[in-house]
């Protein structure tokens, strides 16, 4: 059985890890980075690039570079009014679903996420030297059912069997507690502020058991929001100074975003930073430059409400877990945004102690996912992970009321049944409206799905007995059934992702992804063949120039013809032809080497074979008095004191 890899599919960056020698190892990508930007770019040549190469084209090609797609996955188009304005690429509705429009071709958020997952899969395969087909993928703890299902679909499109969807804070706690002294029980809080989401989880650790007591969060709060505040400030300041509105210029906006992220990162270690963007735009008077100084105090002032938004989820999580802040032994900091000094201040304020920096905030989640992969694969023993469902699940009952069947922070997997009845006399069917959320009325919560149970015998209201059962699996994905206890009729529903991807659409995307992977492989093969050919032409021409007068005219002509043929082949995209003609030139070029060795032999003595026999002698015999091959002679060594040389 192959390895089960762990993937942290992040908003800003992604990371992949695997268990090696009983420990989780973070795998560097082909560019050498331990994390990979979660960015997909489409070049002017219709090629697709992922990671750093995609990030490199963000400024020059903003409309064809997709980033922060995790903020959209599993959402309906109507839920994204504010988010849509923040990105330069085009997002359009397809029914209720979200699609990303790249030159008229529509991509689902799952497909874009799958391209990132494929990059992580390839990174792991290059490292392990074997095909990878199974993965554990992490999601924010506060992701709802639709977002979890959409993430699972993305894995399937990428050619991965998703063995488990695991919550990011839980994964980080695994990385923190793995192989530690497991006898001592600890209560920890995981404060996870990433690029697009915020989670807080309270866990109890001890004797190999990792039990989540409560979780809370905000799936629309992360580093991107802090960057946007700086961008808005820069736009306003520049407009005040010049009268020019940069928010209408997509290329300028992308430069501002990069500068804002850089400024935010710098302000974690310095009190003041400069934002310098020469030639940001131009008007009739010539080019304009942007130069602004930003202090940490000013940054914290403009983002104060964002920092405040992390406090309430922390208080709710503590309340749901039934513990006070003083009972927390450690606070783990996860996600790059936790490096901001203000975050450390907030943690001290809420929990009364400093946050722990014992795990790498960028890598801990992927490492925890790899450990979970090890547990599922049987490589890791004596570790039990007990997670919870982040939101209450229930149905709509009479009067539009939301009736929860499974309350938030219930340990999963779990199953719960409740008996309901009809609301009207003679009712022969009931419509089950499945919801997720914490509000009292059904309309205020998120619809997961609807289904009907039909064929109920007519009876007075309140007489039929309809048993509704909720089943949440270990991935946090919901299955619901309704059964008429009188007739035994039953109806099941597996809540599908609100992305609306059908099985046939997912299968089509899987096939497209496989075809693209094959195309990528062929493209790489072609590039390597061309590089080898170029290198051989250069080397052969150089040698021909130096040794041309030492080989016969016929041989020289043959080599030059082979070079010309290969040059012509390079103008085409026929990899097989390039390889064949490279081989022809290689064979022809051997003639040069042959002539060189012949002439060296001739110079060494009248006998043309003298050189080669001397060469053989040199390799096996150091002379009549030296040691012979295959024997071991005693040698005296003299120790030299070289202290004076130091």
Curated annotation (Swiss-Prot):
Induction or repression: By stress conditions e.g. heat shock.
SUPFAM superfamilies attached to this UniProt entry: Actin-like ATPase domain, Heat shock protein 70kD (HSP70), C-terminal subdomain, Heat shock protein 70kD (HSP70), peptide-binding domain
Cystine crosslinks: none
Origin superkingdom: Bacteria
InterPro entries, per database record: ATPase_NBD (IPR043129), Chaperone_DnaK (IPR012725), Heat_shock_70_CS (IPR018181), HSP70_C_sf (IPR029048), HSP70_peptide-bd_sf (IPR029047), Hsp_70_fam (IPR013126)
Region (Disordered): 599-646
Gene3D superfamilies per record: 1.20.1270.10, 3.30.420.40, Actin, Chain A, domain 4, Substrate Binding Domain Of DNAk, Chain A, domain 1
Record's keyword terms, sorted: ATP-binding, Chaperone, Nucleotide-binding, Phosphoprotein, Stress response
Modification type Phosphothreonine: residues: 197
MF annotations from Gene Ontology: ATP binding; ATP-dependent protein folding chaperone; unfolded protein binding
Annotated Pfam families: HSP70
Biased composition (Acidic residues): 633-646
UniProt biased composition (Polar residues): 610-628
HAMAP family, A to Z: DnaK
Homology family: Belongs to the heat shock protein 70 family.
Function: Acts as a chaperone.
Protein known as: Chaperone protein DnaK
